Amino acid sequence: MTETQTAPLTDTRIMPVIHTLFRRELRLVGGLLRSVTAGDTARAAVVADHLDLVGTVLHHHHTAEDDLLWPLLLERVPDDLAPIVHLMESQHGRVEQLLGDITPLLAHWRRTAAAAERDAMAQLYDELYVALAEHLDAEEQRLLPIAARSMTQQEWERMGEVARAGTPEGQQFVVLGMIAYDGGPEGVALLMHGAPPPVRWLVPRLGTRAYRRHALRVYGTATP
């Protein structure tokens, strides 16, 4: 490589596509919870299962970043990362604090469908959405450009593999459909990058179908 040549940027475009899942689902949670009639434990269980799924996907997404993204960037480009380290840490901390507050309430509400717990959780989820949206915006605007020039494509894709491995058994197509819902054709193409043509054709359709069924059960509509 000559002095005028530079390494190609790593393609990080999939990250904002994945973030659409969290933005949409968490934006809807407050209203979803408040719509559950007090004492309706059957409905509470459906909603709680959905919130558990979204929370699990978010947890593994952040864990993969914490384990594979941050240590590598801090080692390679500490000066580039310095201006945003404290911001990202404080935002992550706030998100984890809210999730920690929600977890015991959700476990109890699943069994009781009590109005007080429902309303407390709805408020916490409203706060979580605001905190997470702020964090995702900062990550996309400030962190991804650093990652694109500091990581190899293999390192970047490894992080995605680790995050996906945490998807609950039997929910892979639902989660794929959640991501594809707002991702559009370009997002679906990024999700399926490198897959054989039959897989690129079939899997997104299975994901869309699975999320439609899931959304009908959770929201009462296939297009929440």
Task: Identify what each model region corresponds to.
Residues 1-224:
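Small-residue-biased structural context
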